[in-house]
Amino acid sequence: MACPLDQAIGLLVAIFHKYSGKEGDKHTLSKKELKELIQKELTIGSKLQDAEIARLMDDLDRNKDQEVNFQEYVAFLGALALIYNEALK
């Protein structure tokens, strides 16, 4: 049986691949795919406006290829984890 942290990491990977590749490259998230992931998988997603998601996409897309790769996605999750940690203090 997998440990809880192993399961959590597996879930983060599975969610990325659930949305990546719906259009184009199966190893990256397009703006549309990222928007769908955020809106369906995060509580805050339904509260974000299109312009906010576009800004987030621009911030996450470090190599400016108009897509979010797995490394950029993990950086996003790390930033979210820091925010969640601060909220628990």
Curated annotation (Swiss-Prot):
Binding site for Ca(2+) 1: 28, 33
Annotated GO CC locations: collagen-containing extracellular matrix; cytoplasmic side of plasma membrane; cytosol; nuclear envelope; perinuclear region of cytoplasm; ruffle
Molecular functions per Gene Ontology: calcium ion binding; calcium-dependent protein binding; monoatomic ion transmembrane transporter activity; protein homodimerization activity; S100 protein binding; tropomyosin binding; zinc ion binding
Keywords: Acetylation, Calcium, Cell membrane, Cytoplasm, Membrane, Metal-binding, Nucleus, Phosphoprotein, Repeat
Subcellular location field: Nucleus envelope; Cytoplasm; Cell membrane
Post-translational modification Phosphoserine, affected residues: 46
Membrane-related topology note: Peripheral membrane protein
Modified residues annotated as N6-acetyllysine in this record: 40, 47
Domain of life, source organism: Eukaryota
Predominant place of localization: nucleus
Residue numbers binding Ca(2+) 2: 61, 63, 65, 67, 72
Residues carrying N6-succinyllysine: 47
CDD domains in the cross-refs: S-100A6
Residue stretches making up the EF-hand domain: 12-47, 48-83
Role summary: May function as calcium sensor and modulator, contributing to cellular calcium signaling. May function by interacting with other proteins, such as TPR-containing proteins, and indirectly play a role in many physiological processes such as the reorganization of the actin cytoskeleton and in cell motility. Binds 2 calcium ions. Calcium binding is cooperative.
Subunit note: Homodimer; head to tail assembly of 2 subunits. Interacts with CACYBP in a calcium-dependent manner. Interacts with ANXA2 and ANXA11 (via N-terminus). Interacts with SUGT1. Interacts with TP53; has higher affinity for TP53 that is phosphorylated on its N-terminal domain, and lower affinity for TP53 that is phosphorylated on its C-terminal domain. Interacts with tropomyosin. Interacts with FKBP4. Interacts with PPP5C (via TPR repeats); the interaction is calcium-dependent and modulates PPP5C activity. Interacts with TPPP; this interaction inhibits TPPP dimerization.
Name of the protein in its database record: Protein S100-A6
